[in-house]
Amino acid sequence: MRANRNEYVDALMTRRHNGLVKVLTGIRRCGKSYLLSVLFKERLVAEGVPEDHIIEIPLDKMEFAHCRDAVRLGEQVKAALVQDGRWNYVFIDEVQLTRKVLPPDVDLARIAPEDREDAYLTFYDTLNDLRQTDKVDVYVTGSNSKMLSKDIDTNFADRGFQIRVHPLSFAEYCEAKQPEDKAAALSDYLVWGGMPLAVAEDDENARARYLVSLFDEVYASDIKKRYRLKDDYVLKRLIDVLSSATGSLTNPHRLRNALESVLKAGPSDHTVANYVEYLEDAFLFSEAKRWDVKGKRYLDYPLKYYSEDPGLRNARLGFRDVEPSHMLENVIFNELCARGCQVDVGVVDVGDRRHEIDFVVNRVPGKLYIQVALELPTDEKRRQELLPLRRSDDFFRKMLIVGRYGAPRLTSDGIVEVGAIPFLLDRTILDKALAG
């Protein structure tokens, strides 16, 4: 079983030798290390790069534990460089494990308390130094909030480029599993998702145990350690609430009320908002804001949250209430994000009633409104689903993703209708719709 993840490898290949540090971020266990150390490395070697010109530093391995010092990391890499006029490729895995270092000639007592943090050397200093070394191309992976977009933008300025890596998409899932029945494969994907090791596991009980363990042994533990939480009980209950509310409108106050019904004494709205931010920072959930289509403005609350992977969401709920229709909406949201789109939830006022467009999709060169439905069994259901698209009162393209199969077709009122499987497997369908 293998997914070649060509979109990511191609993105890395096109950004070689551009003078920037290439930073692969994403949820832990989504395959960043494999992408870099196996797939990208194979492509480089196939194009003639000698293997001794590829320096790999997996910081999560005991063999390289000594490199978790920011200064020693740089020294280790420079000692391994081949000086023959050809490019060296440096792969540093889990770079956030690197510790900051105080230079020996710096006396903190002579520095104002508010400036002391700047006295330390961090992995950002190491990476920026390596980036400026002749014929050195730097690639790193990071999994948690030490490698956030805002941190990368601040510390690298215009010297770093972030590539967000997601779990296997449905297309990558099919590439790896080679299913004959795509409809059955989609049903399986809506339950188990695309975490690579879960996809590779054929035994459903083992697959379920693995997905459940990720929350307790990896994600919740990481967040507790990173933010120095006294315990992770409230955090785990919040994960449960967000998982059960996937794709539903909510806000911190509603989440607090839901927690209060479970805990009998809920945390404050402020604490809930902070915890939600921690979960987003760990790439477990993504926020979708609401966009007033006719008023052309964002609405503050409520908003929606989607899980990074349907299998993780279902595992958190014990694989009860899988809700295939909601999971399909979640999968389409993730697919749009992975394809580089900005995705909001649309609001359309019709008379005195407020209707929803599942997704308002923005990406150069255009905008697209999308409704998603696993099935529309009656004409009335179909009319209700299409109403907000028809009453948006603008010229942007509209799409209805309905059912599993169904080649793209244009309806009499100009709406592109397509099945979920063709949409997820053929990227050109979205490209053409956005291009108008």
Roles of regions detected by a PLM:
Residues I55-R86:
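Short glycine-rich substrate-engagement loop in P-loop NTPases that contacts/grips substrate
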Residues Q96-Y139:
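Conserved Walker B catalytic segment
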Residues M1-H17:
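Pre-Walker A adenine-sensing motif
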